[in-house]
């Protein structure tokens, strides 16, 4: 019988691993990767054919294309060769390793100590173990990292990260003395076992120059995990190469995938020289610098684009993937996952090592060895722990998962592409940290470059501990498609002086006229009011002002905390209204009656009737926030129609509730919102009580997430016309030391 492989011309071996090897073939001028595996019996071989079946089911531009599956008898064993598309640019992990800065090989918890790794602390290149190899495979790029680290051994590099909200947009360095924190796997092993190409393991230990360095957990990924066949030939070093040898190897390696990169300006321009001024030589060599003619003498710095093959890799990388290329890649990955899910497949091992780059720089999902059919399952699928530890969701670590676990892993890859910080190199284990209540969402958000902070809430939602709160792949695609990449182009304005000076103080009745106008102007486009006070109606703002003036009077009788911020000329530019702890959050029937009588002559009987319905709806919202029901499918019909919170226990009232907040449009982006909210948040932390609020649109979430709020509940049914959903946001009190 003719050998089925005879029609393919063998080019070279690409990689060998614990489960087999990958070989490059050519047929009719087209190159293919053959993934070879040996099995002892037919039953095991049939299991091995699952990957071929999974590949054959998916035909999509963003998944690796299946070509053929060949089964051959070799003695007592069965060999299966799966032929698939060859992606000549290699895998995404190798590409990211080439671009990313060498990191401390420390275990990291995304808590308050996260920034001690490389986000704001000083460190020297000599502290890094240059012998550590990448998890699941070895790569010659490690020699590049080791060489560059040796060249920088005597240089102290200082990094900074954003610790700002969307409101103030400032940058501050992290405390350089913060010690790194150690985490361990459930087995509490203190060394990292890295599978080599031969299937054996090598131990990675902390650098001798850093005796206090925490040890790293052992990765559950076994040497027999499915092979990533698209990678190029590499050699696992048996000894430390000399500096000259490594230099020679580095010079022979060329970057094959070339994409546009952009300068991370917020990191670049805030580097200071010894005199505490912005280093002029640094900014002018990479950006266009102009001085504004305004009185504040602002410094405007425009974005600069460079190709990835022009970048000299160093320990203080200032480059990010250019915004258009980044969004294209994020969409490539999303389209690939969408194709899987539409075919009722769960990949279960999404990671940057299993993402391949085609000749046209398109990303393709591959390695379907752990993919599983989900069409005949309802609810969660119960199985053994699978996947790769750094990218594993909390539920997959608990062996219970569904399609949403792919969303979690996809969020991890998004994080690596956006930040160029590799999870495995930084020892970041998101799923483990969430299971052990060590994950700090605020610290996670602060690791994003300010240039791409608009993407941070999306990624945070994708890695939500609760799978129910993760967005669908369709929702992710819609968000990315609607994103205007021009808004991600960076233009940094350094304010030479603070142009906003004012005072924050509590309001009394004499301020309600001005506060109500500010609220009316800010909330005229609130979806709750679309049908009552259309934004296009010139009378809507005056009518809303009457309504808010009455609301402020009522809330003041409840002893609520009403705060305003006044600019230097005495104009009120911000207003925050808080319902205090220990007070029932409800709208009383008597207030509704008084309100309808006082407003009927000002806004008309019909609108008063609609407002009464709205008050009932608002009362249900207070009940939602008070009970903090964590079932996102709960609707207002399941709550009490009126005075919904009156039956709640007194303990459920013990939280601050932000009822209204607004800042005049021309004063936004100057940190006023953060200044207004921080006093109550500090009180809440001191007293150990929660803070809650409610939002009706996704674009309102970002500000609150930057201040530690998370989505506690979401409601989508039985809502007033114009309101698509209601989200209750909850902020847990931070521990004060």
Curated annotation (Swiss-Prot):
<dbReference type="GO" id="GO:0005524">
    <property type="term" value="F:ATP binding"/>
</dbReference>
<dbReference type="InterPro" id="IPR011009">
    <property type="entry name" value="Kinase-like_dom_sf"/>
</dbReference>
<feature type="active site" description="Proton acceptor">
    <location>
        <position position="349"/>
    </location>
</feature>
<keyword id="KW-0808">Transferase</keyword>
<dbReference type="GO" id="GO:0005634">
    <property type="term" value="C:nucleus"/>
</dbReference>
<comment type="similarity">
    <text>Belongs to the protein kinase superfamily. NEK Ser/Thr protein kinase family. NIMA subfamily.</text>
</comment>
<keyword id="KW-0723">Serine/threonine-protein kinase</keyword>
<dbReference type="InterPro" id="IPR050660">
    <property type="entry name" value="NEK_Ser/Thr_kinase"/>
</dbReference>
<feature type="compositionally biased region" description="Polar residues">
    <location>
        <begin position="156"/>
        <end position="167"/>
    </location>
</feature>
<keyword id="KW-0547">Nucleotide-binding</keyword>
<feature type="binding site">
    <location>
        <begin position="14"/>
        <end position="22"/>
    </location>
    <ligand>
        <name>ATP</name>
    </ligand>
</feature>
<feature type="compositionally biased region" description="Low complexity">
    <location>
        <begin position="168"/>
        <end position="229"/>
    </location>
</feature>
<feature type="domain" description="Protein kinase">
    <location>
        <begin position="8"/>
        <end position="488"/>
    </location>
</feature>
<dbReference type="GO" id="GO:0004694">
    <property type="term" value="F:eukaryotic translation initiation factor 2alpha kinase activity"/>
</dbReference>
<feature type="binding site">
    <location>
        <position position="36"/>
    </location>
    <ligand>
        <name>ATP</name>
    </ligand>
</feature>
<dbReference type="InterPro" id="IPR008271">
    <property type="entry name" value="Ser/Thr_kinase_AS"/>
</dbReference>
<dbReference type="GO" id="GO:0016747">
    <property type="term" value="F:acyltransferase activity, transferring groups other than amino-acyl groups"/>
</dbReference>
<dbReference type="InterPro" id="IPR016181">
    <property type="entry name" value="Acyl_CoA_acyltransferase"/>
</dbReference>
<keyword id="KW-0067">ATP-binding</keyword>
<protein>
    <recommendedName>
        <fullName>Probable serine/threonine-protein kinase DDB_G0269628</fullName>
        <ecNumber>2.7.11.1</ecNumber>
    </recommendedName>
</protein>
<dbReference type="InterPro" id="IPR000719">
    <property type="entry name" value="Prot_kinase_dom"/>
</dbReference>
<dbReference type="GO" id="GO:0006446">
    <property type="term" value="P:regulation of translational initiation"/>
</dbReference>
<dbReference type="GO" id="GO:0005737">
    <property type="term" value="C:cytoplasm"/>
</dbReference>
<dbReference type="GO" id="GO:0106310">
    <property type="term" value="F:protein serine kinase activity"/>
</dbReference>
<feature type="region of interest" description="Disordered">
    <location>
        <begin position="278"/>
        <end position="298"/>
    </location>
</feature>
<dbReference type="InterPro" id="IPR000182">
    <property type="entry name" value="GNAT_dom"/>
</dbReference>
<dbReference type="Pfam" id="PF00583">
    <property type="entry name" value="Acetyltransf_1"/>
</dbReference>
<keyword id="KW-0418">Kinase</keyword>
<feature type="region of interest" description="Disordered">
    <location>
        <begin position="155"/>
        <end position="251"/>
    </location>
</feature>
<dbReference type="Pfam" id="PF00069">
    <property type="entry name" value="Pkinase"/>
</dbReference>
